[in-house]
Amino acid sequence: MLKPPIITSNDNNNTKVAENLNDLNNKGKMSGQQIESFSPWHAQTSSSAVTGTSELFGSTYAMLSDHSVYPEQWSGKQLSQSVLFEQPQIQPLVGNSYDPPVRFDPPYAYRATATGYMPTVPGLSTNSSPYYPRTSGYAAGQQFYAPSLSGVPNTQQLILAAQVAQASNVQQQLQQQVLRPEPLRPATQKSTNGVHRSTSNSSAETLRNNSVSAATVSPSDDNSLNSPALTSSGSAGSGTPPLGIDLNNTDLESGDEERVMCMACRGVYPSRRSLTGHIGRNEKCREIIGRNYLDALAQGVNPPIPGTDAAIKSGAITTGADGMSPVCPFCDRFISHYKGNIRRHINQCRKSAEPMKRHRVEAHEKQSPKKKVKKEQNEMYQHEYNDHDSSSMSGGMMNSPKISPPSSSFYGANSSDLCSPGEYSNSAYEPYPTPMLENTERTSTETAVLQDAYICEDCDFVTVYKGNMKRHLNTCHPQPEFKSLKEWDQKLEGMRASNLGISGDRLQERLAAHKANSSRGRKPRKKKENNTEESESIDFKNILNSETGALLESLASSSSSMGGYSNGNNFQPPPPPPPMLL
C-alpha cells in the first residue's frame, strides 16, 4: 500500500496543482465542458516526484464530491482567473449590479437582465438557480457547494447567445421604426399618363385636398349632398367611411383589391356591389351621372352602353372614366351590374316612343299599407267631424258642447240606453258613415280590366293578364316573326277586347265560357270503365228497375179495370201482394 508523500513545501504543491488544473482544463475544452475555476480540493496536498497521481485523484474527487470542505490554508488565498483558464466574457449578460447572496462569478452570473436572450438558445435556460452558499452544522467553518457542471454554458453557447441578442436588437429597432415612422418627404410618382407629379402625404395637404374636392364636386351650394366625399359615411346612410383616394388618379384597380369610384361624388368603394348600393340610395348622384351621359349624347359622343363588353373593356363601370354607371338615362331607373339586364332594359327604353319617368319614393315617403289606410281613415273622420261641428254652430246651438266620436265599445255596452233612431237623427250629432272607398276603387279597377281583356283570335282563350296571353301565344301559337319587344307589344295590344270591338255582355259570355272550359276548375274526374264486373252490375240493376216498373204499371191498370166488381157486401177484394224482388 502506497503512502502519500510528505509535504515539503507549499509553493511546490501550488505549482503542481496549477499544472494539474491546466491539464484538466485542456481536456475539458476538448470534451466541450468547462471546469469550475474555484473548486476546492478535499484531499491533502502532497508532492510526488514520480507521477503525482495522488494530487490528480484528490482534485478529481474534490470536483465530483458534493461535500468537499474548503481547507483553512486556502481561505485567504485565491487563484486568479488568468492562472486557471481564460473565460470569454459577454458584457450584456453580466449586469452592473447584483444581489448580495448571488455569487458573482463570470460563468454563473446570468441575471434577470439576460432573460430575453436565454430562451432563444437551445440548452441555455435561465431557470437554473443561482449559486447560494449553504452552511451545515456538522462541518466547522465556511462551506461552499459548487453548482452542477451540466448547467454551465460553454464558449460556443455564449457566442451563439450574443449573436441572437444582436439579431433581436436589430429586429426590435426595425419594429419601432415601422410603428413610429418619421414624417415622409414629398416623393415623385409616375401616373398612368407617364407624367411625374409630386404628392405630399402630410395631414395638412390631405385636409386641403379634401376641402378642394368638396368644393369642386358639389353640384350646388347645398351641403346636403349625401356622398362619402362630404360626409363621414361610406354610403348613404351607412357608417362605413369610403377609402382614401387621390382625386387626380382614376386608375383604381390593382391586382390584389378592387376599388371603384362614384364619378358624381368622388367616393371610392371597395367593390362594385357597394358602389351599386350607393348609387341606388343617392338620388343626386343618379341625376349627375344621367346628366353627364345626356351631355355626352348631345355633343355627338357615343358613350358605350353600361354593362356591355365595350363598356367593361373601356373601364366605364369599373373606374367611371367616362361618367357611366348602372343608371338608365331614359327612365332614370337604377339597374344592376348584370350586363344582360342592363342591355335588355336599355334596348327596351330606347325603342319605346315614350319612356316613362317613374316617381322614385324616398325614404321619408315610404309607408306601410296598414299605416297608409289608417292615416286616410283618420283624416276622413277628422274632416267630417269638423264639418259637423261647423254646421251645428251655424244652426244656433252655440252652447252645446262638442261630442267626441263614438266608439264601438260604447255602442256595444250602452245600446239600450241610447235614444231612438228618429230622435238621434234629429239631433245635431249624426253618426259617421262607414268608409267604402276601397271597395268602390277595387270594383272600378276590376271592371276596367274586364272590359279590356285579351282575347285570342285563334281559340277561345281569354285572360285579363298580358303575361298569360304572351305565354299562351308562345306555347300554343308560336310566332317566330316577332323578334323584338316592340312587335310583341303591338301584337298584344291588338288582341285587347276594346280593339277587337268586343265589350259588354259578349265579353262576359266569353269569360264565362273560358272559365267553364278552363282546366283550373274543380271538375269531377270521369270514372274509368275498364272494370267489366262494375259495368255488368250496373246493366243488371237497370234491367231490374225497368221490369219492376212495367209490372207495377200492369197491376195498376188491372185494378182500375176491376173497379165495378162487388160481392154483395160492397167489399172490394184486397190488392194483390207486390212481387218479390230479388
From Swiss-Prot:
Residues 352-368 have a biased composition (Basic and acidic residues). Keywords: Differentiation, DNA-binding, Metal-binding, Nucleus, Transcription, Transcription regulation, Zinc, Zinc-finger. Residues 179-251, 352-377, 513-582 are annotated as: Disordered. The keyword Amino-acid biosynthesis does not apply. It is found in: Nucleus. The keyword Methyltransferase does not apply. May interact with swsn-9; the interaction promotes hypodermal differentiation. DNA-binding protein which binds to the promoters of let-60, lin-14 and lin-28, possibly to regulate genes involved in hypodermal and vulval development. Together with miRNAs mir-84 and let-7 may direct terminal differentiation of the seam cells, exit from the molting cycle, and vulva formation. Does not regulate the expression of mir-84. May promote hypodermal differentiation in association with swsn-9, a component of SWI/SNF chromatin remodeling complexes. This is Zinc finger protein somi-1. It comes from Caenorhabditis elegans.
